Structure formats: C-alpha cells, structure tokens
C-alpha cells in the first residue's frame, strides 16, 4: 500500500467533488468485539486493554507499518477469518476541505477497481474524526526496495512484472481513470510476487475530449508535456511513466535524472537517454514506443500488448485486455461460515447485492482470499469454492498454476518473494469453531489507541515495511494527499556510500506539493484547480539559479533516499492551514460534509490567486528544505509488531516456505543463531528487543547522533531443507543505504 506523503491532486474537472464512502460509514455504531476470543469491544474505534492488542472493528491491530503526516498504516488481522490486511488510518480533523475532497475521491476510485494487480479495498469505516480504509496487504514489499537490494531485473523477470503492470494500468484507462503517480515506489509485491499497484491519491477520472491540467507526479517519471505546462488527455502521461518504469526494471536506474530540477527538466524535454549494452534490441524497441516526446505519437497500451518483447515466452498467449469477472456473491460455503459467525442471510445478501464496503462484505471477500502459507482460498478446514476469475493466459495478471504464463511468473516469484515475518499467525478455526461477531452497541467512540502525528512531528514518516509504502515528504503540505502513509521513514543520509553498493543504485522519490504557480507567466489557478482562461499555457523555464537538490556522485546524480527531485509534486492550490483560507484567497468556512452524509457537495469557494514567483524557483526552494527535528520517536510497543506476547508453545522458528530471499543460511540450532545475532547487533551498536522467540527488533543511530535512524528486524527461520536455518533481514524505517551497511556488518560478524 504506497502510500506516500504527496500533494493532493487538484480538482482538474468539475466532477472532482466529494466522493461517497457510502455504506462503509459506521460512526453511529459503537462497541463490537469477537465474543469468543476478546469480549466486548468497540467495532469502529480503537481500544486496548492490558492483555489484548488494540482493535478496530473486527480487526486486531498488530503493528505500524507506515506513517504519514496525517495518516498511519497498520498491519492488522481480521478476527473472524485470520486474514492479514493493511488499515490506513486518516485523521480527518487535520485535513482542510480540499484535502478531504481529494481523499474521498481516492476512496471512490478505489471502490470501482477490481483487478488482481491493484490493491483491493475491502472496507471503509468512518467516525466523526477518523477514516479507516481496510485494504489488501502486499506482504513482499515494494518493487523499489527490491531494486535497491538486488539491482536490476533480468528481462524475463521484468517482463513478467511489466505484463501485470500494463494489464492493471490498461484496466484503469478502460474505466476512464488515470493514475498519474506510477513509479517503482507505488508498485507492491504480494506473497506470490505478483504486482499490486497502490496509491491512487493523485488519480482522477478523465473524459475523452476534455483536458486535465494538474501537474502532479514524481519528476523523473513525469511526461514532458507536464514540464511544459500543457494540458493533457490523461492516459498518455501514464504511458510515459510506464516507459520509465520499464527502463528502471531492466537497468536498475532512471533514464532521466539530474542534480536539480532544472537539469532534470532539460533532460526530459530532450528525451535522450542511454541504452545499456545488456538491453536487448526488442526491449530497446518497446522503450522507444513509450518514451516519445510528442504525446500524440506515443503508443497506446493496446499496441503495447501486441509488441514482440512483451510476449516473448508467451507464444499463443498474447497479452490481452483484462476482462473483469462477474462478482460471485452466491458462494454458499462462505455464506454458511458467515451465518455461523452470527451474520444473518438477509444482511449478507443486502451488503453483497448493494456492494457496501462494510464489515459484512469485507468478511465475505476475506474468506475468499488466499492464505499466504497454504496458498489455498478459504479458511483451513473449509473447502471454500473459488471465486470465478479470468484466465491468466489472456490477461497477464496474477499467476495461476498450469499455464506457461505462470511458469514465467513462478520464476519471477522465486526471485522476488519475501516472506512475512510474523510467527504469531494462526488461521481461522474450522467452521464450527469460527469466532462469532458480537452485537453492536450504540455510541460513537473516539480513538484511544494513539494520536495521529502532529504537523511538526509528522514531517518524517516511519514505518512498508513490507508494504513498501514510500516515506512522507519532509516538507510541504502532505495533507493534500492525506491517504498516504510512508514506509519507511527517510532522513537525508549524511554518511558516505558503502563501497559495495553499485553507483547506479536506485533512490527513493519523495512526494511534495507544488503549492503556487506564477501569476504573470502561468495561467491563474482557481481554488478548485481549474485554470483561468486569461493566462498562458506554459510553465516558464527553471530559474538559472536553481537550487542544487542533491550532491552529484559519479556520472549520474546519486541522490539520498529522500531525494527531492525524485519526489512526487503537484501543481494544485494549498490551503493556508493557519489562516484557514485557500491559497487563492477564498475563505473556507469548514470541512466539507462527509460524503457518507451527502452525495453531492458544493464546490469550494473560489478566489483570486495571489501573485507568486517563478514556479520552479518556488518549487526548488521548497524542495531543498530539510527537516532538522528528530523524527517521531520509535519506542515502546511501536518499535515493532513485537509487543505481542510470546506464544508459550512456540519452540521452533517459523517455517519459511519460499526461501529464495534468504541470503544467510546455517545448520546451527536456532537458539545459537539468536545468541549470535544478539552479539552481532550489539557489536554494531544496535538497540534491540526480542518481541518473539526468534525475532529481533533493532534500532540504530538517530537521537541526535551523527548516524541516521535505522529500524529493522532480524528473524531466524526454518528452511524447507531439514536442519537448515535462514536469517531474514527486513528494513522497517530508515534509508536503504544505512540498512544495507548494517546488514553487511552484522552478516560478516555472524561468519555464516
């Protein structure tokens, strides 16, 4: 789940009004808990007791996996089914009306998407002050993190991933939705290494013949027409970004980069990039179809699906548009299980028929999800019928046994798979023992688990962990895309690059808001994001005195993980949070009505834009700002999932079914490995806790010291081969460079 701190997309069209959260809202419901296991608890609020973990609705919160300025992402487990989910928790009280509007639009768009390579939204829970989005958990992390750790992909592996990306993006375009922030940080991997596109915070609906004018996205992935300030139809900017992504997958670096925004802009507008010697002719050919300066001559995704390179190894299985299957809401086995949980057939039918994003629909959908360990749908002991799905051979989506497409996908999966690290997983009990939902009491209970990070403390994001959700931007108004939580936290790394790191190593792109545009050289922007027709249509060139955004290193610029020119930014208006007025001068009288209460909302008041300086001068000055305060402290139970009590019966490490991501193996007893790990981490000056018998949660640096803060976990796992154990390292927060340095140091000390 990307979720990144980013500028919220502007309202490109009049249709950008408040979305409808609809049936997902349940603020009028009060405490509800699993009567079998947890006693009475509030279904739609967070609560905690001395011996239990906090809960939200039917979900037990396990740990924080991402943080943004006004949002958090929690890894949680659905009590009734045992499935893991990611819950995005957004503090609505911190958001201005424009930000709320964009948040509701994102939710509305996610409700309409049902593709195996797009993160699925299961449930929406809304209270007066908080919005909870229950989404699919992509446990294997970001494609970005893989590229940082392993470098470029082989073309066969990149092809398997890229087919899924193209299928998902084409599906969005078929539904008249443009993503506008496609990049490696927003591509997640599930337990089977299938792509999951996340972070629709900048997405918008488009109409043929109607132009969009909002400049948003990460500069290295942004199309040239965006740098020129031209209006665009929509899909063509995603197609350019797909070309950059393909180049990145195959080469491990970016086709367009620069020491500052001015240099990057010039390179993008030239459209010239280096072709690595190892890139095949067919791959080079398809790249040239994506990276075309003239958007009118850029290829379409329908043409790409017929390209030779994308279908190599898939003879007879040409990539075709995804056909969304008819929803199977009549699975009697799942319905019977839900009846055993305490739901009535009537409410099940109503929720599924009306497609309400409430607890009933979420339970039904989660019962049909695969378990990561078993790979089968449904709960253990239940022969749940599979939901009908289209064949992978035609749609190039998630892997399915038996097809040649799956052969390539399995090969890719073996390379990229990262297992989740929780040893406390226990699937749902057989049908007769399924926990029952408890009755709902009235009353709207507010959050008690923990406060959302404040504006100052929220400048850094902590957390994607596996959800490779990218970190929050350290500066400007990420409230404008509140539904973004960052993983992991990034601070600019002042340390030198380790010698064992490749010079072209990937660096993360932050997310920012371009808050103002020049009034004299750029079309005036109304607070609703519409352009004033009295202006011109181009962004002026960058100021010659552009601020340097990152120090160069080698032939290509080498930026820290939080590098600014790789940040997503957006040319919308930003409300002055202190004055409570829009940047255009329109007074905001309060947040918009919740879309769960009103399906139509009046447009935000408009006003005259105030005069500003050059766009790129303003942007670069903001992008060069750095947060000097210490990031929000990671301490206590928030350090890891590990404040969970040990399972007293657990005497062996977790069995790692897919061991391809394990780099260190040993035949030592697991207890001896843990002892060696404790010594090695102590020698590396890490502060460690042991939340589970075979898991260490470690912190290094930070607290005002010279070294950046790094938060990671080390787990000893049992491999399928008898008598062989593996050591898994997982970065939770901090820069990739610092993490890799620590892993190398600890691994050398282990002498495995």
UniProtKB/Swiss-Prot annotation:
One of its GO terms (cellular component) is dendrite. Serine/threonine-protein kinase. Phosphorylates the microtubule-associated protein MAPT/TAU. Also phosphorylates the microtubule-associated proteins MAP2 and MAP4. Involved in regulation of the microtubule network, causing reorganization of microtubules into bundles. Required for the initiation of axoneme extension during cilium assembly. Regulates the centrosomal location of ODF2 and phosphorylates ODF2 in vitro. Plays a role in cell cycle progression, specifically in the G1/S checkpoint. Reduces neuronal cell survival. The modification Phosphoserine is found at residues 423, 543. The modification Phosphothreonine is found at residue 214. The active site is at residue 181. Disulfide bonds: none annotated. Its cofactor is Mg(2+). Residues 703-752 form the KA1 domain. This is MAP/microtubule affinity-regulating kinase 4. Its EC number is 2.7.11.1. Residues 1-36, 385-615 are annotated as: Disordered. Belongs to the protein kinase superfamily. CAMK Ser/Thr protein kinase family. SNF1 subfamily. It is found in: Cytoplasm, Cytoskeleton, Microtubule organizing center, Centrosome; Cytoplasm, Cytoskeleton, Microtubule organizing center; Cytoplasm, Cytoskeleton, Cilium axoneme; Cytoplasm, Cytoskeleton, Cilium basal body. Isoform 1 and isoform 2 show similar expression patterns in the central nervous system and are present in the same subsets of neurons including pyramidal and non-pyramidal neurons in the cerebral cortex and hippocampus, cerebellar Purkinje cells, and interneurons and motor neurons in the spinal cord but not in glial cells (at protein level). Isoform 2 is the major isoform in brain and cerebellum. Also expressed in spleen, liver, small intestine, colon, kidney, tongue, testis and lung. Isoform 1 and isoform 2 are expressed at similar levels in heart. The gene is Mark4. Activated by phosphorylation on Thr-214. Pfam families: KA1, Pkinase, UBA. It comes from Mus musculus. GO terms for molecular function: ATP binding; cytoskeletal anchor activity; gamma-tubulin binding; microtubule binding; protein serine kinase activity; protein serine/threonine kinase activity; tau-protein kinase activity. ATP binds at residues 65-73, 88. Residues 59-310 form the Protein kinase domain. Disruption phenotype: Hyperphagia, hyperactivity and hypermetabolism leading to protection from diet-induced obesity, and improved glucose homeostasis due to up-regulation of AMPK kinase activity. SUPFAM superfamilies: KA1-like (SSF103243), Protein kinase-like (PK-like) (SSF56112).
């Amino acid at each position: 789940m990307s979720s990144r701190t980013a500028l919220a997309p502007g309202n490109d069209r009049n249709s950008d009004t408040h979305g409808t959260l609809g049936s997902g809202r349940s603020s009028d419901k009060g405490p509800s808990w699993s009567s079998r296991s947890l006693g009475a608890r509030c279904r739609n609020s967070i609560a905690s007791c001395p011996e239990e973990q906090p809960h939200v609705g039917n979900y037990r919160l396990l740990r924080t996996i991402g943080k943004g300025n006004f949002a958090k992402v929690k890894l949680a487990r659905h009590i009734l089914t045992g499935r893991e989910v990611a819950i995005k928790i957004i503090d609505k009280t911190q958001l201005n009306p424009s930000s709320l509007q964009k948040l509701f639009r994102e939710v509305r768009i996610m409700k309409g998407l049902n593709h195996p390579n797009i993160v699925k939204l299961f449930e929406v829970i809304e209270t007066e002050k908080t919005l909870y989005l229950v989404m699919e958990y992509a446990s294997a992390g970001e494609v970005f993190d893989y590229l940082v750790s392993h470098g470029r992909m082989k073309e066969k592996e990149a092809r398997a991933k890229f087919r899924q990306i193209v299928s998902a993006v084409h599906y969005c375009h078929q539904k008249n939705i443009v993503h506008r922030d496609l990049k490696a940080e927003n591509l997640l991997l599930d337990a089977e290494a299938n792509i999951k596109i996340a972070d629709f915070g900048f997405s918008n609906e488009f109409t043929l013949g109607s132009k969009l004018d909002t400049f948003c996205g990460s500069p290295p992935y942004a199309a040239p027409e965006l740098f020129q300030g031209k209006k665009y139809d929509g899909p063509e900017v995603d197609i350019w970004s797909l070309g950059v992504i393909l180049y990145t997958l195959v080469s491990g670096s970016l086709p367009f980069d620069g020491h500052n925004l001015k240099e990057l802009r010039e390179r993008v507008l030239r459209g010239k990039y280096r072709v690595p010697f190892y890139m095949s002719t067919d791959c080079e050919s398809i790249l040239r179809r994506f990276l075309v300066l003239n958007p009118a001559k850029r290829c379409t995704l329908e043409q790409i699906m017929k390209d030779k390179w994308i279908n190599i190894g898939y003879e007879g299985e040409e990539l075709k548009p995804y056909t969304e299957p008819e929803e199977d809401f009549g699975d009697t086995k799942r319905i019977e299980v839900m009846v055993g949980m305490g739901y009535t057939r009537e409410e099940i039918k109503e929720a599924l028929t009306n497609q309400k994003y409430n607890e009933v629909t979420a339970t039904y959908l989660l019962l049909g999800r695969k378990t990561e360990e078993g790979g089968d749908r449904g709960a253990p002991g239940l022969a749940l019928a599979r939901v009908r799905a289209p064949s992978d051979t035609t749609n190039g989506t998630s892997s399915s046994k038996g097809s040649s497409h799956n052969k390539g996908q399995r090969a890719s999966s073996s390379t990229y798979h990262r297992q989740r690290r929780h040893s406390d997983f226990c699937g749902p009990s057989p049908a007769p023992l399924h926990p029952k939902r408890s009755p709902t009491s009235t009353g709207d209970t507010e959050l008690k688990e923990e406060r959302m990070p404040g504006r100052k403390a929220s400048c850094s994001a902590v957390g994607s962990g596996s959800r490779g959700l990218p970190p929050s931007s350290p500066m400007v108004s990420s409230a404008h895309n509140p539904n973004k939580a960052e993983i992991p936290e990034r601070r600019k790394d002042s340390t030198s690059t380790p010698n064992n790191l490749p010079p072209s190593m990937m660096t993360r792109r932050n997310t920012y808001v371009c808050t103002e545009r020049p009034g004299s050289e750029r079309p005036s922007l109304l607070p609703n994001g519409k352009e004033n027709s009295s202006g011109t249509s181009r962004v002026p060139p960058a100021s010659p005195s552009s601020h340097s955004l990152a120090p160069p290193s080698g032939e290509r610029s080498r930026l820290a993980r939080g590098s600014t020119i790789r940040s997503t930014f957006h040319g919308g208006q930003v409300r002055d949070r202190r004055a409570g007025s829009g940047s255009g001068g329109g007074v905001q009288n309060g947040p918009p009505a919740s879309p769960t209460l009103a399906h139509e909302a009046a447009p935000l008041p408009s006003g005259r834009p105030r005069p500003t300086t050059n766009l790129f001068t303003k942007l670069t000055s903001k992008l060069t700002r750095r947060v000097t305060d210490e990031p929000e402290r990671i301490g206590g139970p928030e350090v890891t999932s590990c404040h969970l009590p040990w399972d007293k019966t657990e005497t062996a490490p977790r069995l790692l079914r897919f061991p391809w991501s394990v780099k260190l193996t040993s035949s030592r007893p697991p207890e001896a490995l843990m002892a060696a790990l404790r010594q090695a981490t102590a020698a590396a000056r890490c502060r460690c806790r042991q939340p589970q018998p075979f898991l260490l949660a470690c912190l290094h640096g930070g607290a005002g010291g010279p070294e950046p803060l790094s938060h990671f976990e080390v787990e000893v796992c049992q491999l399928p081969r008898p008598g062989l154990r593996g050591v898994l390292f997982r970065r939770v927060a901090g820069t990739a460079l610092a993490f890799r340095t620590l892993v190398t140091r600890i691994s050398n000390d282990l002498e495995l």
